[in-house]
């Protein structure tokens, strides 16, 4: 099973972005979703679902918050989920 983690795009340089995932800045490749939206505007501030360093899809903020809440609930039961959220067990 693959789990994507929501993150908010902070900066973009070409197809690479700095994405905030639970307060941690991660390097993410935007090749699959593009660095600009359908109107040609940079995706800075938008939410993406991140898996193994790639933005897999663009999601809205409500979906991002719901997913983060669900992952946090999983973390409360299974500490290994912390690696997805925080980069290590917390």
UniProtKB/Swiss-Prot annotation:
One of its GO terms (biological process) is protein maturation. GO terms for molecular function: carbon dioxide binding; identical protein binding; iron ion binding. The record marks 2 as: Important for interaction with HypD and the precursor form of hydrogenase. Disruption phenotype: Deletion of both hybG and hypC completely abolishes hydrogenase activity. Pfam families: HupF_HypC. Involved in the maturation of [NiFe] hydrogenases. Involved in the biosynthesis of the Fe(CN)(2)CO cofactor. HypC delivers iron-bound CO(2) to HypD where reduction to CO probably occurs. In complex with HypD, accepts the cyanide ligand generated by HypF and HypE, and also coordinates the carbon monoxide ligand. Involved in the maturation of the hydrogenase 3. Also participates in the maturation of hydrogenase 1. It comes from the Bacteria. This is Hydrogenase maturation factor HypC. Belongs to the HupF/HypC family. Pathway: Protein modification; [NiFe] hydrogenase maturation. Homodimer. Interacts with HypD. Also forms a complex with HypD and HypE. Interacts with the precursor form of HycE (pre-HycE), the large subunit of hydrogenase 3. SUPFAM superfamilies: HupF/HypC-like.
């Amino acid at each position: 099973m693959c789990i994507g983690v929501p993150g908010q795009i902070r900066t973009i340089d070409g197809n690479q972005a700095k994405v905030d995932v639970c307060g941690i800045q991660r390097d993410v490749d935007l090749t699959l979703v593009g660095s600009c939206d359908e109107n040609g505007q940079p995706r800075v501030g938008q939410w993406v679902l991140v898996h193994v360093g790639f933005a897999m899809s663009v999601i809205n903020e409500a979906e991002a918050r719901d997913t983060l809440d669900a992952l946090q609930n999983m973390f409360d039961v299974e500490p290994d989920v912390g690696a997805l959220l925080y980069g290590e067990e917390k």
